[in-house]
Amino acid sequence: MRAMNLTLLTDLYELTMMQGYFKNPTDQVVVFDMFYRRNPCDGGYAVMAGLEQVIEYIRDLHFAPDDIEYLKSLNMFDRDFLEYLRGFHFTGDVYAIPEGTVVFPREPLLKVVAPVMEAQLLETAILNIINHQSLIATKAARVVYAAQGDGVMEFGLRRAQAPDAGIYGARAAVIAGCIGTSNVLTGQMFDVPVKGTHAHSWIMSFPDEYTAFKTYANLYPDSCILLVDTYDVLKSGVPNAIRVFKEMKEKNPDFKGYGIRIDSGDLAYLSKKAYRMLDEAGFGDAVISASSDLDEYLIDSLKAQGAKINSWGVGTNLITAKDCPAFGGVYKLAAIKNSEDREFEPKIKLSENTEKVTNPGNKTIYRIYDKENGKIRADLICLADETFDESKDMIIFDPLETWKKTKIEGGSYVLRELLVPVFQKGECVYSSPSVMEIQKICRQEQETLWDETRRLVNPHEVYVDLSDKLYKIKSDLLEEMGTAALKYQ
């Protein structure tokens, strides 16, 4: 979970392919792209997350003696290959989109440029890390958006699929805008706020609800959120909470940070009734927090119903991304060159499914912003050595429906290159921001999205297009591959 050597966190076929390359020596340097094809949760975007853990993985990549012994026990790997693994370390380059950035289908979130054996080994761990955290960050961003500025707390540890999913899922949730997590270990590891109240068992362990509330308020006067649905929200919970608030206020006029949490029942109805009772008692500024199997759709519905809730604790549906439990990231070969070659040879993977045909070449991505309002107009995938003049018109092509072309007038847009260097010649050259710094980045990133892209249902799709040069290379390869295929029919 922590301080582990994750080198064997890989699929077996990565190692069998490595041995194949080892036994058939090659000096090939390759380019692999990590990207995804569809936005999770039927949304309009995703949030990049997990880069810090990828950096840690690559930086510590080595085969320990017990790793070598285990691989030897499989009776699949020759002695000379195992000896090679003893001295293995990463020597290549990695480029990535920074964490917290909003991203879209088909564009490389991460690019590896390295000797073929090294690049191949990285595949599984990179996908495991980025797929998980980007999924949870995306789900959390949707939940935070639905809350319309109210605080959202991540409460899902007990429902997460194992400790690591809880730890790093909470990290991703905070990146996406959650104000804190109930997960204390995540708080310690990443210096993020930890939040929580008390359970029904606290109430039940006392002779009566009032005594339980009073005891808790005396213990935590600056963070006194009382769970009011153990017995009856309106007949018992809220009246007892008001009684305690009055007593605390009499003792300390500066008493604040108080409120209630409702964990069951009709949240819209109960919150309205509870607010009226609190307001009439002089506590209209109380926090009214809700939990109970929330997700972005229920929060959006409660908002539409006028629920008097201003704080949300979201657990199962967030930490598991229950309605969209997988992020479909893939890792595909895009280009190859031998040591004597000056330029990469583009490679393309064909498929019966158009969306699975890859984009060839050593590429980068430019984000195209509207110069007036700062909103994203499109993303442009191009070759890594291409440059553009913002004063000139730009023609871009849809990678799937290539007859669709868009002209963006010169002077009306601003470009930003998304992929940044992370490793150069095996050395990390990137300084990871803190989680709370990434959260600020993510908040700013989401402001660059049009409202139509952020909406929860049937969002507008942001265009991810190809440059003229890349479009021509892809078209030529498709024609060449198609002609070659005809020879075998």
Regions found by a protein language model. Give the residues of each.
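N-terminal, Lys/Arg-enriched amphipathic/low-complexity engagement segments
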Residues: 26, 30-86
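Hydrophobic residues within beta-strands of alpha/beta enzymes
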Residues: 195, 260, 288, 310-312
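Buried, small/hydrophobic-residue-enriched core segments of structured protein domains
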Residues: 1-29, 38-40, 76-77, 82-91, ...
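Short acidic, Pro/Gly- and aromatic-enriched capping/linker segments at domain boundaries
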Residues: 94-100, 413-418
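An N-terminal, globular interaction/scaffold subdomain
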Residues: 56-61, 96-99, 103
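Short coil/turn segments at secondary-structure boundaries
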Residues: 69-70, 138-142, 156, 454-461
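Short amphipathic C-terminal alpha-helix that caps PH/PH-like domains
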Residues: 58, 122, 126-130, 442, ...
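Gly/Ser/Thr/Ala-enriched C-terminal appendages of enzymes
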Residues: 1-28, 32, 41-43, 281, ...
